[in-house]
From Swiss-Prot:
Zn(2+) 2 binds at residue 130. The gene is Cryaa. Contributes to the transparency and refractive index of the lens. Acts as a chaperone, preventing aggregation of various proteins under a wide range of stress conditions. Required for the correct formation of lens intermediate filaments as part of a complex composed of BFSP1, BFSP2 and CRYAA. It comes from Rattus norvegicus. Residues 76-185 form the sHSP domain. Belongs to the small heat shock protein (HSP20) family. Heteropolymer composed of three CRYAA and one CRYAB subunits. Inter-subunit bridging via zinc ions enhances stability, which is crucial as there is no protein turn over in the lens. Can also form homodimers and homotetramers (dimers of dimers) which serve as the building blocks of homooligomers. Within homooligomers, the zinc-binding motif is created from residues of 3 different molecules. His-123 and Glu-125 from one molecule are ligands of the zinc ion, and His-130 and His-177 residues from additional molecules complete the site with tetrahedral coordination geometry. The keyword Chaperone applies. This is Alpha-crystallin A chain.
Amino acid sequence: MDVTIQHPWFKRALGPFYPSRLFDQFFGEGLFEYDLLPFLSSTISPYYRQSLFRTVLDSGISELMTHMWFVMHQPHAGNPKNNPGKVRSDRDKFVIFLDVKHFSPEDLTVKVLEDFVEIHGKHNERQDDHGYISREFHRRYRLPSNVDQSALSCSLSADGMLTFSGPKVQSGLDAGHSERAIPVSREEKPSSAPSS
């Protein structure tokens, strides 16, 4: 019995515009700009591709695509905007660990609003290794209902780890829900926060 092997449906739908090869098989040389536009590259002879696409893409699109690639692939671990922190809630304690190494205690504001803790950090423009930078972030976490809000504390370790903690009360006792600011104290030793 003969079985006909057909191309996948998405290849047939694009017809001649879909390339039949994978990046011209130049695996060790990286991508050319025309490899990112396969529907155009398959209709143009390889002899003309390099100069044609180089002319078109030298108009600024290449720089934009390169910038977008670097933004998508840069690490964001130290940025609180992209680092939600670690939250631990066990039987007798609630703790939040947040990496804020670019901020001093004066740059941080920690508030408790009903059942939420809000952590806001902002520093004005300052110089670093690459030029001038200003940073700002805002994080909001829900507090468990049995956290004693009158005993909440917040500290910033020498390595820039903010630790917000509060004990949990036994069920049936008042947890003291109200709005108040929590001062951020500085510790001289590095944090004992869990690593990722």
